[in-house]
């Protein structure tokens, strides 16, 4: 299960006691969750007004950064065109898997110096992730165009004889070329009607060259045949052929055009291969950057919310729980019993779906302790 609950509770005599109490209640005694301390450094608190405003801004930033993390992960899956396991291998944070990164979280002092104000740190994160989002849009657009153009050409060379490009199938010898009077047509003949074609093609119109038809290719349902006739009989031949379920394809043998199409396909294929490696590398690096930023936003939110709820001086313990799916309800009840004394408004039914005025959270998401969910299930496989 890739869901974490990031919570905080006020320090008792010491923060260590708070941690030991939670660990005993959730992990040690009954194995409801895997629990670990979540280390948040001593950040600059600032004024109450700033904290209240920042609380709303961080909620928006959290949603934005999570969206970018998911976009980068999903695009990685699209680019790799591969199995879920292969994608997961590439979704790392700081070179380790996501669970390891979260459970061993250490604040990045170099990226987000704690001497800066909370607002400045949130702005540094917002700026960095916005840049990733913009870069992703432009890189994805360029790669998707390339991929789309290549797929269009590949699609032309696939499908039935009625629709696919015939350039790869026919040869110069299959045509009478450079004749003032004669022309070679390509006709798709249903296999069920092939005997009728053999008997009729010479008489479908005047001036058809006898014994000029050969089978050039076939698919599941049809044969591709050529036939040579005088140019002035072409319209009449087309009309009569259609009446007999023989379809004349619009095709002119042009070596220059065919060569250009082939070169274009080779060029697009080469370009795609050239771009693939650097793009995957960029996605790996920037997924890591965005994910790290996201967990720092979660840390900021816990810090700000804990100060707003539990007051000053700063005295709280942040803790990370990885719940067992089958015992999530029981875990909620245990946490409620541990911390219900913190907030009388949460003493109602734990999961009542009621709105609390002045809060962005419904009652379902409001608990007497600070709580944020981290969902690492980032991919939506179709």
Curated annotation (Swiss-Prot):
It is a peripheral membrane protein. The keyword Ion transport applies. GO terms for molecular function: proton-transporting ATPase activity, rotational mechanism. GO terms for cellular component: clathrin-coated vesicle membrane; plasma membrane; synaptic vesicle membrane; vacuolar proton-transporting V-type ATPase, V1 domain. InterPro entries: ATPase_V1-cplx_csu (IPR004907), Vac_ATP_synth_c_sf (IPR036132). It comes from the Eukaryota. GO terms for biological process: pH reduction; proton transmembrane transport; synaptic vesicle lumen acidification. It is found in: Cytoplasmic vesicle, Secretory vesicle, Synaptic vesicle membrane; Cytoplasmic vesicle, Clathrin-coated vesicle membrane. Its main location: membrane. Gene3D superfamilies: 3.30.70.100, subunit c (vma5p) of the yeast v-atpase, domain 2, Vacuolar atp synthase subunit c, domain 1. Expressed in brain (at protein level). It holds the Pfam family V-ATPase_C. Keywords: Acetylation, Cytoplasmic vesicle, Hydrogen ion transport, Ion transport, Membrane, Synapse, Transport. The modification N-acetylthreonine is found at residue 2. V-ATPase is a heteromultimeric enzyme made up of two complexes: the ATP-hydrolytic V1 complex and the proton translocation V0 complex. The V1 complex consists of three catalytic AB heterodimers that form a heterohexamer, three peripheral stalks each consisting of EG heterodimers, one central rotor including subunits D and F, and the regulatory subunits C and H. The proton translocation complex V0 consists of the proton transport subunit a, a ring of proteolipid subunits c9c'', rotary subunit d, subunits e and f, and the accessory subunits ATP6AP1/Ac45 and ATP6AP2/PRR. Belongs to the V-ATPase C subunit family. Subunit of the V1 complex of vacuolar(H+)-ATPase (V-ATPase), a multisubunit enzyme composed of a peripheral complex (V1) that hydrolyzes ATP and a membrane integral complex (V0) that translocates protons. V-ATPase is responsible for acidifying and maintaining the pH of intracellular compartments and in some cell types, is targeted to the plasma membrane, where it is responsible for acidifying the extracellular environment. Subunit C is necessary for the assembly of the catalytic sector of the enzyme and is likely to have a specific function in its catalytic activity. This is V-type proton ATPase subunit C 1. The gene is ATP6V1C1.
């Amino acid at each position: 299960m890739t869901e974490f609950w990031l919570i905080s509770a006020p320090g008792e005599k010491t923060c260590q006691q708070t941690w030991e109490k939670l660990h005993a209640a959730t992990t040690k005694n009954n194995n409801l969750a895997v629990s670990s301390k979540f280390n948040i450094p001593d950040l600059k608190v600032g004024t109450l007004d700033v904290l209240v405003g920042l609380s709303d801004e961080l909620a928006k930033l959290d949603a934005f950064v999570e969206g970018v993390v998911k976009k980068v992960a999903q695009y990685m899956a699209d680019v790799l065109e591969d199995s879920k396991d292969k994608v997961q291998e590439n979704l790392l944070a700081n070179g380790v898997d996501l669970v390891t990164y979260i459970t061993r979280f250490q604040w990045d002092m170099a990226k987000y110096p704690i001497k800066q104000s909370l607002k400045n740190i949130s702005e540094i994160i917002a700026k960095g992730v916005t840049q990733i989002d913009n870069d992703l849009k432009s890189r994805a657009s360029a790669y998707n165009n390339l991929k789309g153009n290549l797929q269009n050409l590949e699609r032309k060379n696939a499908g039935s004889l009625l629709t696919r490009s015939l350039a790869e199938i026919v040869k110069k010898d299959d045509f009478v070329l450079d004749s003032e009077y004669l022309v070679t047509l390509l006709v798709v003949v249903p296999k069920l009607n092939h005997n009728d074609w053999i008997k009729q093609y010479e008489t479908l119109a005047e001036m058809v060259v006898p014994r000029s038809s050969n089978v050039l290719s076939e698919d599941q349902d049809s044969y591709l045949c050529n036939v040579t006739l005088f140019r002035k009989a072409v319209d009449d031949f087309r009309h009569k052929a259609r009446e007999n379920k023989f379809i004349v394809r619009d095709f002119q043998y042009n070596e220059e055009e065919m060569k250009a199409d082939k070169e274009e396909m080779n060029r697009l294929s080469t370009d795609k291969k050239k771009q693939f490696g650097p793009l995957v590398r960029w996605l790996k690096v920037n997924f890591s950057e965005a994910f790290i930023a996201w967990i720092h936003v979660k840390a900021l939110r816990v810090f700000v919310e804990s100060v707003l709820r539990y007051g000053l001086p700063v005295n709280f313990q942040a803790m990370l729980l990885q719940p067992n799916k089958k015992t999530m309800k029981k875990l909620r009840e245990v946490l409620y019993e541990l911390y219900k004394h913190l907030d009388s408004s949460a003493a109602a039914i734990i999961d009542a779906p009621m709105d609390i005025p002045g809060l962005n959270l419904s009652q379902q998401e409001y608990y007497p302790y600070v709580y944020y969910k981290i969902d690492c299930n980032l991919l939506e496989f179709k």
